[in-house]
Design a protein with these regions (language model features):
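Bacterial N-terminal signal peptides that target proteins for export
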Residues: 1-11
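Beta-strand-dominated extracellular/periplasmic modules and repeats
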Residues: 24-150
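C-terminal motif of bacterial Sec signal peptides marking the signal peptidase cleavage site
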Residues: 19-22
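Flavin (primarily FAD) cofactor-binding/catalytic cores of flavoenzymes
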Residues: 15
């Protein structure tokens, strides 16, 4: 094959790759903020929770901000957790936060958590949360968070 006959094929291949990359469905968004590790552990009535606790992190300064980051975690089998914003266990941006907790069994048939919170929604309101903390530009250990069902 001559160089002239390869050029159109090469050009067409590059165009297909470029179109595929441009139409990949990935949304562009705001720049990712720097994050800092936040870890801790959870007990419920003095015991390691099973099923795991779902943890949501709420920025106190931006509860109404539509561009805020969303950070969360799920407790592990040993009761420990690491908050995440962009990928597993990466941390959260610096700031002031409150945590909310829910404890729901996972329904394998429906492939989702049940509607019943075993903590009776006691820890569901970020404005009433007793677990508040500040993340400076360094790792933060929240220690043991003790939740109660009664």
């Amino acid at each position: 094959m001559s160089r002239l006959s390869i050029a159109p094929i090469l050009f067409a291949g590059l165009m297909v790759c470029g179109i595929g990359m441009g139409c990949s469905g990935k949304k562009s968004g705001p720049e990712q903020k720097p994050v800092y590790k936040v870890t801790g552990s959870i007990t419920v009535d003095g015991n390691i929770p099973d099923p795991p606790i779902q943890i949501e992190c709420h920025s106190i300064d931006s509860l109404e901000d539509l561009n805020r980051t969303f950070s969360s975690a799920q407790s592990k089998k040993d009761g420990t957790f690491a908050l995440e914003t962009y990928k597993e266990g990466d941390g959260i941006p610096a700031g002031d936060y409150s945590l909310t907790f829910s404890w729901r069994k996972f329904d394998l048939i429906r492939r989702q958590h049940s509607d019943i919170d075993l903590l009776k929604n006691r820890y569901a309101d970020p404005l009433k949360s007793e677990t508040k903390f500040t993340v400076d530009e360094k790792p933060t250990d929240l220690g043991e968070i003790q939740l109660k069902t009664k």
